[in-house]
């Protein structure tokens, strides 16, 4: 992005990579895919990708430089830890620039059904039949 920030929605990838959802789709749907390799578990100093200037580190990690899980951490957790109930909603609720506007909402979970409500009003109801909660 022009402002030097990366989106937590994980909709972009470098030319030599792909978004996590693509990996998970292939793992779930193709018998010949036996796993994945995550090159960057933690952000690190150097190789300022996806930016080439005015950046100090890589931004691809699942965990930031301080060891704090990023939003995508919960996406991986929902796939890698089916024995642990994960429900993670992003973005945060107090986005001042978006008051009164439509905001994309992502939910990372192992659950088969998700219902989003605001002030007892149904916003969305999604079923994920391919998910098998443990």
Predicted regions and their residues:
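Extended substrate-binding grooves/exosites of carbohydrate-active enzymes
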Residues: 1-129, 134
């Amino acid at each position: 992005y022009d402002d030097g920030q990366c989106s937590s929605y994980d909709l972009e990838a470098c030319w030599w990579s792909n978004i996590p959802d693509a990996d998970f789709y292939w793992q779930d749907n193709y018998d010949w895919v036996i796993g994945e390799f995550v090159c960057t578990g933690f952000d690190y100093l150097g190789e300022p990708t996806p930016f080439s200037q005015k950046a100090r580190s890589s931004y691809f990690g699942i965990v930031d430089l301080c060891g704090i899980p990023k939003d995508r951490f919960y996406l991986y957790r929902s796939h890698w830890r089916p024995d642990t109930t994960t429900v993670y909603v992003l973005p945060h609720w107090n986005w001042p620039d978006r008051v009164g506007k439509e905001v994309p909402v992502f939910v990372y979970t192992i659950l088969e059904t998700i219902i989003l409500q605001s002030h007892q009003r149904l916003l969305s109801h999604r079923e994920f039949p391919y998910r098998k909660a443990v």
